[in-house]
Amino acid sequence: NKAEVRGIFVGKTISYHRIDVEKMRGLFIANDFAPFIVLNRADALSAQIFSFIHELAHFFRKSESISNSIDFRDSNKNVNAEERFCNRVAAELLLPEVELREEFYDKNGIERIAEIYKMSNIFVFYRLKDIGKIHHGQAGNLESQILKETEENILDRQKKRNKGGNFYNNMRDSNGNLFNKIVANSYLQSRIGYVEASSLLKFSVEKI
């Protein structure tokens, strides 16, 4: 809501047009008049939060972005400097280094932190690895194990997810509050007609 108050449009992908998280987790379109952040509805909530902050960092740096891949949170990954910077901004805000007091963390420690901060195990692992809190000799095995569990969890969520849902609620969520409000106000002020407003919203303007 605070981002939208600042004039940043925040929406999500459409539920009936699924985009794999491996292809896109978050998207930022830089525009001085109407900047857009789009999150992938298919992603886990904790991952959407990370993606939102990551894309918000792009907003302040005025750099467009498409974030993807299962391990894009790894700040040491072979990606460009801009992406690494935005990853680190999001990581520090969500899991401050000052709170991570142990010298090294094992899998139990990773899971404990993930539970406390309501973040995914893979995010916590990469955060700890980035600041040198994962023992070098254990990093490879831990990464493989947690990545495997992460992929299995994603598949489980996909099987359990209700692919239908409430169409109007899903579309409101996809459009974002700011977009819905602007279209509805324009209709109520007679600046656009009923057909145009409903076409923009992808549902009847009366449903707002």
Task: Identify what each model region corresponds to.
Residues 1-208:
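Active-site hotspot residues in diverse enzymes, especially metal/ion-binding acidic/histidine motifs
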